[in-house]
């Protein structure tokens, strides 16, 4: 089984108004932890979409118009991801997506590759989230009085990192920083059972 560890950066939280600005992913063997492939790019957007940016989102991720206008077109990004997933065998029952917040990442990912195309390519429809994994693991420990409840420590990615005594995510928030931090937290919480 392979995991597609994925993160996106956007110019706001509303997928009806805002657009994906950056995507990063790593394709990882979930038994060994071996990284098979990685992909990261800034996604160009038209000036009209940029002008609708939420300023708080841009403050967090630090993107500027100069960076965005030089990005790869959404069509180019889509084709590169399709080619990479085909090469790596990202298919239903053989892979899952893993994110910090898949309800957010999935809807913006679908701006690049729509749900019908994903279905046609037999891509996984399971998008797993780190927070739920952490929640389940810490609830089990809390039942045995070996851990505080997850709502006492928090379940943001930085809170999960702190729980495992890991550093917080590098700033500014960029997609590959998010993927690297997600993998670090995933390994601490869940692990790779056959990692050498």
Segments (PLM) and residue ranges:
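Conserved non-catalytic scaffold segment of RNase H-like nuclease domains
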Residues: 1-103, 162-167, 173
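Short, surface-exposed amphipathic charged segments that create phosphate/polyanion-binding patches used
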Residues: 55-58, 137-145
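Amphipathic alpha-helical interface surfaces
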Residues: 77-81, 105-108, 112, 126-130, ...
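Acidic, Mg2+-coordinating catalytic module of metal-dependent nucleases/exonucleases
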Residues: 96-103, 107-112, 145-196
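A short alpha->loop->secondary-structure connector
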Residues: 114-124
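Short, flexible loop segments at boundaries between secondary-structure elements
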Residues: 123-142
